Amino acid sequence: MEYNFTTIEKKWQKFWKDNQSFKTVSKPTDKKYYVLEMFPYPSGKMHMGHVSNYTIADSIARYYKLLGYDILHPMGWDAFGMPAENAAIEHKTHPAEWTLKNIANMKDQLNLLGYSYDWDREVTTCLPDYYKWGQWFILKMYEKGLLYRKGGDVNWCDHCNTVLANEQVTPEGTCWRCDGEVTKKKLEQWYIKVTDYAEQLDADLKLLEGYWPDNVIAMQKNWIGRSVGAYINFNLDDGKAFPIFTTRPDTIYGVTYMAIAWNYDGLLDMCTTEQKSAVEEFIKKSAKIDQKTDYEKEGVFTGRYVVNPFNGEKAPLYAANFVLAEYGSGAVMAVPAHDQRDFEFAKKYNIPVKVVIQNADNSLKAENMTEAYTEDGTVVNSDILNGLSSRDAIKRAIEYATEKGFGKEKVQYKLRDWLISRQRYWGNPLPFVHCEKCGVVPVPESELPITLPMDIEFTVGDNPLKKSESFVNTTCPKCGGKARRETDTMDTFTCSSWYYARYTDAHNNQMPFDPSAANAWLGVDQYIGGIEHACMHLLYSRFWYKFMRDIGLVKGDEPFNRLLTQGMVLANSYESRELKKFYTQEQMNNKEYEKDGIKKEDIIVKMEKMSKSKANGIDPAEIIELFGADAVRIFVMFVAPPEKDKEWSDEGVKGSSRFLNRIWNLFLKYKDEEAFKNGKSFDYNNLSKEGQKLFRKYNKTIKKVTIDIKDRFHFNTAIAALMELLNDMSVIKLANNDDYAMFKEVIRGYLILLNPIAPHMTEELYQILNFGKMILEERWVEHDEQYCKDDTFELVFQVNGKIRDRVEADVNISEDDAKAQALASEKVKAFTDGKNIVKVVYVKGKLVNIVVK
């Protein structure tokens, strides 16, 4: 019987769909498991990165189902966003039409892989039944004082024609989505006050240690940026207060200048008349840089001085492009001797350097310094702090400032409030109106959802919503007068920050979800997605969960109990640097580079993340058609551990296909043998030696596969163990009825062990071989520890360190017997006869080495 994967896979996919095989129970038992992968943006085409991510999740879900858990494994669509709007402009189609068509296409593609999704719980963020509740949450945040509107400098992408949050600007100063240049622009924007939760977000990372990757925790910790220091009230030379935040009050006597952010509110009012125009020019220049990038640190003197409260000294005040207006007070004290950035700035503008922390050999002198001394040491030239260690001086300086009333200890965070305004159409509308009489007024909950208008003209440029009179013109909910609807839509991360909770009660039209349903399933037991979301989606989701907790919708403190960040899928890229052109694998095979006048040796070959731009993407649908879904699933799970990058290889997926064919052919070989069909039970003691050996190997394989999956999700080593077992199964000669019954049990267990990864073929074989239930209804096989220990082992015989024979020996063999067997071996004697035996060495459980001359 031929292994026709196309027919088999279609059969089981139809069966699972028709029988609602993966429908979630409404009320799980205590034995529940919620596995979730980050839902995709519906671009219309699935890529191998999706396949890798979703196969990991599906294998985990199927494994836990076999363990007897109630499973929640849903799927949905992160469906708002700019690509749909850009497609509307390009293809003259509405974003909704484009998006829903893409969803249908991607859903069909996902189903080709046999994933165990409960499609009854599908959510689509661009549909009103979902985004209504996003608006509801925003109103609740507004009520609690967590949502506000303010003007200020924002990150602006001209290409996308919208605002970007700080997290959406790359370290290179470009847009995270389009790689376009990011500039500064002044706008009135909506913000969520995530800083109110900074302390919790930081402290609760401890709850995730051991369950989330260390690097993700470190990235979030750094992004939140908790630092303990002091607020010190300096004064301007006219007596006005000038507070600064510092983490190094031990260096306060070393301040030789002060720096204030170039975009500090009221900066120009601080400047002297003589310096105002210079500062204005500097502000214009600074607006063009991105403080995330590596740029030249510059400043300009404001004409003003600031008085140090510790010693009364005056320090010049500079406007500087490296100071963040949003951090601390927007101004910093500069200590050039002990901060490298301050040192470089001081050297550039000829500002004095004053040593106040001395090293161990007392050798620091300001005039000899070529770089700042940033280590701890002993405080000098600092009056009340002299002689103290740096750490003790920090405490003493804070105590002194507190006693004198010009300072206090302060915990500061780098985390900024979440800017959620977007000047685009295809997003969730903000539920507010602007009334000339009443100002900004929230829309009543009874009027939700505020739906997007359909009479929209899509052009490159300004926000299309502003041009829709039917949308913009409305009445004020407060006074009934004329009002204009808010035309900013929300950052799409507001949609993805709570979707995991909606899955627990996906069709509730009275509230976002029933708390009892949410608390039965949450937190998510296993969340899977890319590390690129560490400081955006994952941080925002943690904030949103805490907010939902605080308004009584969920219990607990964290949404995701365990996180796996899967590796990328890589493939060879082929680039002509000369032409700045990438070739596909097929074009390379056809030598199309020759038509461009390029030699093969001039093509740069790199293993890189699959992408359209690098022309190295692989279409999963094509591979499934060639080799089947199970072969693709096995390849992506076998090629590397889930957290590591996976290198695509045509040979690799062919190898997975051969593996499945071997299983198919071997297992069906016994289908019609009477001893196999009649095999029911067996006695281990009646098994042949080969049979006993295979049964022990089977039990050891169960143990290894279970540990590899449950403890580490290392499906790659689990598959390797199953391949080893298959090799042993392929060569055994079954000697009696007990052997056949044992072999039948091994086949049954083998199919269950492989089922989470290759569900179609294993289920088909399970039925053909008449094992009764479907695997879907079975339970995971368990090993018997007594059969995980070998009765025998392979004893190696060496002569002068070279292997000359191997025998099977009893595990309890004595040293004398082992040596005697070695000396009696005919293969050994061929190398020892006629020679002088110097010594015989026995290494217990491994080998005998005979040394001869």
Curated annotation (Swiss-Prot):
<dbReference type="InterPro" id="IPR013155">
    <property type="entry name" value="M/V/L/I-tRNA-synth_anticd-bd"/>
</dbReference>
<dbReference type="Pfam" id="PF08264">
    <property type="entry name" value="Anticodon_1"/>
</dbReference>
<dbReference type="InterPro" id="IPR001412">
    <property type="entry name" value="aa-tRNA-synth_I_CS"/>
</dbReference>
<dbReference type="InterPro" id="IPR002300">
    <property type="entry name" value="aa-tRNA-synth_Ia"/>
</dbReference>
<feature type="binding site">
    <location>
        <position position="612"/>
    </location>
    <ligand>
        <name>ATP</name>
    </ligand>
</feature>
<dbReference type="InterPro" id="IPR002302">
    <property type="entry name" value="Leu-tRNA-ligase"/>
</dbReference>
<dbReference type="Pfam" id="PF09334">
    <property type="entry name" value="tRNA-synt_1g"/>
</dbReference>
<dbReference type="GO" id="GO:0004823">
    <property type="term" value="F:leucine-tRNA ligase activity"/>
</dbReference>
<feature type="short sequence motif" description="'HIGH' region">
    <location>
        <begin position="40"/>
        <end position="50"/>
    </location>
</feature>
<dbReference type="InterPro" id="IPR015413">
    <property type="entry name" value="Methionyl/Leucyl_tRNA_Synth"/>
</dbReference>
<keyword id="KW-0648">Protein biosynthesis</keyword>
<keyword id="KW-0963">Cytoplasm</keyword>
<keyword id="KW-0547">Nucleotide-binding</keyword>
<dbReference type="InterPro" id="IPR014729">
    <property type="entry name" value="Rossmann-like_a/b/a_fold"/>
</dbReference>
<dbReference type="GO" id="GO:0005829">
    <property type="term" value="C:cytosol"/>
</dbReference>
<dbReference type="InterPro" id="IPR009008">
    <property type="entry name" value="Val/Leu/Ile-tRNA-synth_edit"/>
</dbReference>
<keyword id="KW-0030">Aminoacyl-tRNA synthetase</keyword>
<keyword id="KW-0436">Ligase</keyword>
<dbReference type="InterPro" id="IPR009080">
    <property type="entry name" value="tRNAsynth_Ia_anticodon-bd"/>
</dbReference>
<dbReference type="InterPro" id="IPR025709">
    <property type="entry name" value="Leu_tRNA-synth_edit"/>
</dbReference>
<dbReference type="GO" id="GO:0002161">
    <property type="term" value="F:aminoacyl-tRNA deacylase activity"/>
</dbReference>
<comment type="similarity">
    <text>Belongs to the class-I aminoacyl-tRNA synthetase family.</text>
</comment>
<dbReference type="Pfam" id="PF13603">
    <property type="entry name" value="tRNA-synt_1_2"/>
</dbReference>
<dbReference type="GO" id="GO:0005524">
    <property type="term" value="F:ATP binding"/>
</dbReference>
<keyword id="KW-0067">ATP-binding</keyword>
<protein>
    <recommendedName>
        <fullName>Leucine--tRNA ligase</fullName>
        <ecNumber>6.1.1.4</ecNumber>
    </recommendedName>
</protein>
<dbReference type="GO" id="GO:0006429">
    <property type="term" value="P:leucyl-tRNA aminoacylation"/>
</dbReference>
<dbReference type="Pfam" id="PF00133">
    <property type="entry name" value="tRNA-synt_1"/>
</dbReference>
<feature type="short sequence motif" description="'KMSKS' region">
    <location>
        <begin position="609"/>
        <end position="613"/>
    </location>
</feature>
